[in-house]
Curated annotation (Swiss-Prot):
Residues 344-354 have a biased composition (Basic residues). This is Translation initiation factor IF-2. The gene is infB. One of the essential components for the initiation of protein synthesis. Protects formylmethionyl-tRNA from spontaneous hydrolysis and promotes its binding to the 30S ribosomal subunits. Also involved in the hydrolysis of GTP during the formation of the 70S ribosomal complex. It comes from Streptococcus equi subsp. equi (strain 4047). InterPro entries: EF-G-like_DII, IF2_II, IF2_N, P-loop_NTPase, Small_GTP-bd, T_Tr_GTP-bd_dom, TF_IF2_bacterial-like, TIF_IF2. Keywords: Cytoplasm, GTP-binding, Initiation factor, Nucleotide-binding, Protein biosynthesis. Residues 63-73, 112-125, 134-143, 179-192, 234-258, 266-276, 303-320 have a biased composition (Basic and acidic residues). Pfam families: EF-G_D2, GTP_EFTU, IF-2, IF2_N.
Amino acid sequence: MSKKRLHEIAKEIGKSSKEVVERAKSLGLDVKSHASSVEEADANKIASSFSAGVTKNVQAGSAKDKQVAEQKAKAAKATTPQPAASKAAEKPAAATQEASQPVAVKPKSRNFKAEREARAKEQVARRQAGQNRSNDRKSDYRQLGRSQGQQTERAGHKSQNQQRDRRFDNRPSSGNNRNDGHRQAGNRDKNRSFNANSRQQDTGRQGQTQAGAPKIDFKARAAALKAEQNAEYARQRESRFREQEEAKRLEQQARQEAKAAALKAQTEDKKHREASAKATESVASMAAASVAKPVDKRRKKQNRPDKGHDRDHGLEDGQKKNKKSWNSQNQVRNQKNSNWNNNKKNKKGKHHKNSNTAPKPVTERKFHELPKEFEYSEGMTVAEIAKRIKREPAEIVKKLFMMGVMATQNQSLDGDTIELLMVDYGIEAKAKVEVDEADIERFFTDDSYLNPENIVERAPVVTIMGHVDHGKTTLLDTLRNSRVATGEAGGITQHIGAYQIEEAGKKITFLDTPGHAAFTSMRARGASVTDITILIVAADDGVMPQTIEAINHSKAAGVPIIVAINKIDKPGANPERVISELAEHGIISTAWGGECEFVEISAKFNKNIDELLETVLLVAEVEELKADPTVRAIGTVIEARLDKGKGAVATLLVQQGTLHVQDPIVVGNTFGRVRAMTNDLGRRVKSAEPSTPVSITGLNETPMAGDHFAVYADEKAARAAGEERAKRALLKQRQNTQRVSLDNLFDTLKAGEIKTVNVIIKADVQGSVEALAASLLKIDVEGVRVNVVHSAVGAINESDVTLAEASNAVIIGFNVRPTPQARQQADTDDVEIRLHSIIYKVIEEVEEAMKGKLDPEYQEKMLGEAIIRETFKVSKVGTIGGFMVVNGKVTRDSSVRVIRDSVVIFDGKLASLKHYKDDVKEIGNAQEGGLMIEGFNDIKVDDTIEAYVMEEITRK
């Protein structure tokens, strides 16, 4: 069956929700509010009760209730004949509805007079019900007074019997609580309409009386209704009293059972603790007592009232907890007011009302089996060991105490103590091998981390080496079909390049290294990462110094050498001479019984290039080059530079594993995450397999060319390793600082007299910076040395100019340009910036500057010789010597020496030179003149005067 909510029923029959709720409660239905739902039959029953004029909860089957209903019907017929007819018509209809339980239907025509009379009767009934509730509350107060020893029941009954009839009185009774004020305000409006209806009814009754209608005794009727209602309320009070007594008894019984359970739990817990105390020793007992939770054995004070009981006591009158009951609320409030002094001592929240319940028993720790092996490290605490072997720290403290070691759970233990402890437990102890996470070199020396099942063949890495302008870049350019050589300044390769080509379905990685003498370190670096070396030699030049150097690098790296004799198309080419010259340095052709392959090529005209590539693949197959692409990537930095928009850019050669974008990486003393990755063609890639050259961005600083790199598990580990490596490098640099001792004291003092040329080097790539700095430091000029104040990659900026001004240095830019702000600041601060693109021109210019830094060297040049013939003494002027030039000439600005008896008695400058009375600049051979010498007046006859000048000589 369908259900209806009470507010829907109220809307259908035109009543308020409150009236419908009260009517449903009076009919014995279990409802709480206007939102409660009832069955269809109960809904019809509620609607029928309003149609029949029922005012109270009348139980079905009660004979007395039927009698009251009959009396109401008779009184209604006697009072109003015409409305009685309508009531009589409604009563059978209501009876029919109760029998068949149909849905109430509104009549087609409304009888307003009958409706007003019905509302007036309902108001009278509600007033009477309110009066009865007031009487009930007074009766409850009397019962409460008797329980507290106040013995006021008889006086209360007397006042109740003497109280006048208040059925039509609008004043509230004194027994209502403060919520009655809201009910009184609502009753005033109802009383106004009731008075108006009463006046209309009185007018109608007068008309009926005049017409001869019988008179009705209202007092007798009201007294009968009141007596019946009082009897019903008395029965309800008796029923509530019995329910309350039963609830008290059940609550007392539950409290006694809870106390018994708590006492039993305490007894069992006490027995358990006594048994454990007897089984263990005193030290273990004390440790266990600190861990175990104590049980609260305090007894609750008897004079403290149970607030939870007081709160629930008023709700045990047969109603729900969330129902409103005027009697129960007043009773609880009075009880609280009477015990206000005791409640002050025990103001606990509602969460503490069940504080006397039995404590939960302490659950025993789950038993765990001991591990078979235990890997420990120095300095582990007792708590850490306990956590690893799944035991209590107190248990380990006890074992250590029995072993003679006093320790707490936070105390560190040495390795011997940990091993003895593990022996006591029967566990095999192993010391943990500490791995230096910052050490990248271990990946290159130990290949135990590689999985043999995942090892596959990789592409060979080939390095092209040779002398300057022997055709290395031209050969690589021919292989890649590009024109790199034309873009290189001066026709020489400035920095290393890495490229990858494909031949016969297989990839080959080529490294191009510079051949200039300044790039020795770059050639050595290229040989260290290569698998095969192609030594290119020009057929017309033969073996050159850098050719021999490349041979030595390849032999030191232990890699096979393939000799490519280039420029065989040129006139004067002599390959046989090249083969014989190489044999002198240990490079013997297979045709001569050696191990080196020789191929005659012409890189310019693409001759025998395929044969060279086939030879490379053949040698690679013999070498069995393998790699594991599944591990984390490791490799070497080929080149590094600082890009204005991208930051630090490093060219890496992957040697093991696969490098991915977003991998955390440590490169030398720097770290970061691979932000972007491009191949040799400038295209973006997401991964790089072994033997693949790529350029990456995302490093915090520019690394050094030749540094190793490794990928770490996460960025946190990579950052820690990078910072540790940078710290170690700084510490090593500080340790290398030379200290002054007695042995090098003279050298230190002598070095203070040596002049220095301060330079700041900025280049496009890191390899060029290294080569340029090394070349400048090798310049040998006596008395002058080069001091590299700062070297870095990238454009010349304002900070470089500021540093140059502070250190009086010259800025040298190699393949870079200064920013506009830096150029403007350099002009303002008078800082010299030299820009170059060819390295040997830089070396020549710096060497000239170093030579110019030395003090000039002077050489004496004799001009002439004169003899004093006569002397003249002039007062206030000095002695004037008359002379004759016997050799050469005497000039005005020349220096002179006075020689007497072959001894130089004075060396100085001329104060004046005259020919007769005229001042002249010089006096020639066999001429006479007069002179005065500054600061010397002791000129005598026959003194010899030598005239000379000091001329600066050029250093070679």
